[in-house]
């Protein structure tokens, strides 16, 4: 915050004239200072996402990914990828490499089968949250565990706060009742809530009833929030959002949230620079 003092000299020997001019000057500076600290937002309606249908995979990209490139949608702070994936029965992503990325998977429905070069082999489903810290490099595969139904999940990539870490894997099963009319933390930097991520980043998920209101406090200056409505309707930071709409918000200490319909909300806090 900048503090300014304006001194206005008036040749007229009228005290009230000088007071009025000084007051007007201070009001102008106050207005300028407030304008500099205005909350910033970017709105990403659901229809503006990249889309690809590969038959076995129907995917929507919030940020540039694979063959979809939008120079204005490269990332939001340290948030690099937010893919909304649906994989048909028995299909999936074959074994492939990653490095220096924090990769979070959040199943929405169905069962997702995971295997990796660290020796992990598991199936995750709604209520589970998985993270791979790729670090110096890992190999992994993800496939639909079931033959007769789709698996739907969010694939989220966050840039780490340090390169070439030793690869790690984390998984947790959350109590869905803890998401009822509140924001449940499912990812945090120290792992005290949810799984641990190597970044100043917190993920929250909420299952909200119409009329629910709250305010989310960011974890310090330089942080931003990216909120996506998974189902229903929610107003975040004054921006009305429908299903799969998203808004990015930064340059603020708090964000007001109101469910205008029964809804499911994902909120991702990340540093805007890292």
What are these language model-derived features?
Residues 14-21:
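Bacterial N-terminal signal peptides that target proteins for export
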Residues 4-5, 10:
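Cysteine-centered motifs
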Residues 119-121, 134-164, 251-274:
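Ligand-binding loop in jelly-roll beta-barrel domains
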Residues 92-94, 111-114, 130-131, 135-143, ...:
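Histidine-centered metal-chelating micro-motifs
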Residues 53-97, 101-102, 153, 160, ...:
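A short glycine-rich, His/Asp/Glu-containing loop-to-beta-strand
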Residues 172-264, 271-274:
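Acidic/His-leaning functional-site neighborhoods
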Residues 99-118, 126-129, 216-237, 243:
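Glycine- and acidic-residue-biased ligand/ion/polar-headgroup-sensing regions
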């Amino acid at each position: 915050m900048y503090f300014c003092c304006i001194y206005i000299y008036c040749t007229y020997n009228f005290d009230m004239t000088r007071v009025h001019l000084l007051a007007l000057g201070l009001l102008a500076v106050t207005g300028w200072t407030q304008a500099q600290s205005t909350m910033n937002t970017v709105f990403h309606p659901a229809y503006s996402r990249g889309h690809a249908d590969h038959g076995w995979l129907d995917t929507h990209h919030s940020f540039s990914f694979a063959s979809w490139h939008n120079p204005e949608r490269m990332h939001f702070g340290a948030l690099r990828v937010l893919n909304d994936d649906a994989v048909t029965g028995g299909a999936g992503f074959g074994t492939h490499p990653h490095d220096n990325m924090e990769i979070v998977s959040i199943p929405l429905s169905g069962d997702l089968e995971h295997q990796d070069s660290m020796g992990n082999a598991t199936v995750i489903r709604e209520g589970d949250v998985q993270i791979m810290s790729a670090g110096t490099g890992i190999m992994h595969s993800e496939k639909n565990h079931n033959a007769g139904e789709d698996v739907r999940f969010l694939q989220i990539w966050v840039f780490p706060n340090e390169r070439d870490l030793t690869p790690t894997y984390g998984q947790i099963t959350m109590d869905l009742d803890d998401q009822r009319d509140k924001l449940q933390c499912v990812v945090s930097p120290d792992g005290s809530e949810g799984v641990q991520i190597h970044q100043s980043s917190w993920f929250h998920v909420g299952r909200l009833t119409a009329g629910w209101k709250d305010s989310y406090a960011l974890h310090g200056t330089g942080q931003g929030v990216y909120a996506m409505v998974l189902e229903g309707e929610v107003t975040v930071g004054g921006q009305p959002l429908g299903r799969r709409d998203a808004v990015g918000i930064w340059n603020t200490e708090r964000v007001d949230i109101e469910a205008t319909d029964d809804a499911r909300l994902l909120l991702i806090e990340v540093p805007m620079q890292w």
